[in-house]
C-alpha cells in the first residue's frame, strides 16, 4: 500500500476490520486502488440468495472524484445496464469527498432493495418494471438464480 494516500489506506483498513453486513470488499493484491467486491442480494428483494460480484476502482483524483463501480455479475435491474454500469447519483453529480467507499457500497446494496425505474440506465428493464412489476420481479429472480447463485 506504499504510495497510496492515507485516506485510502484508512478506508481499506476499516473495510477489512469492520466489514459491512452482506458486503465483502477486498483490495486487489497488485493494485490497492482496485477492489473485488461481493454483495449478497438483500433479503426480501428479487435478488435474495444471489451473490453479485462488482469491481470498484479509485481514480487518482479520489476522493475529489467518485469511485468507478460496475457489476461483473449479470443482473436484471432498471438501474444497471448490460455492461454492469450503475445509475446512482452519488457515483455521478451527487458525489462528495465526504462520502467513502463504504457509503457507495451501502448505496448500491440499497439500490438492490429498491430499484428505481424512474431513473433508469436499462430503459427496457425500467419499462418492464413500470408496466408489469410482478413480471419484472420474476425475471430478476430468474436472472439471480441463473447468474448469481453458485458463482463464487
From Swiss-Prot:
Species of the source: Homo sapiens (Human)
Annotated function: The UBE2V1-UBE2N and UBE2V2-UBE2N heterodimers catalyze the synthesis of non-canonical 'Lys-63'-linked polyubiquitin chains. This type of polyubiquitination does not lead to protein degradation by the proteasome. Mediates transcriptional activation of target genes. Plays a role in the control of progress through the cell cycle and differentiation. Plays a role in the error-free DNA repair pathway and contributes to the survival of cells after DNA damage.
GO cellular component: cytoplasm; cytosol; extracellular exosome; nucleoplasm; nucleus; protein-containing complex; UBC13-MMS2 complex; ubiquitin conjugating enzyme complex
Keywords: Acetylation, ATP-binding, Cytoplasm, Disulfide bond, DNA damage, DNA repair, Isopeptide bond, Nucleotide-binding, Nucleus, Transferase, Ubl conjugation, Ubl conjugation pathway
Gene name as annotated: UBE2N
UniProt cross-references to PROSITE patterns, sorted A to Z: UBC_1 (PS00183), UBC_2 (PS50127)
Name of this protein: Ubiquitin-conjugating enzyme E2 N
Family (UniProt): Belongs to the ubiquitin-conjugating enzyme family.
Crosslink site: Glycyl lysine isopeptide (Lys-Gly) (interchain with G-Cter in ISG15): 92
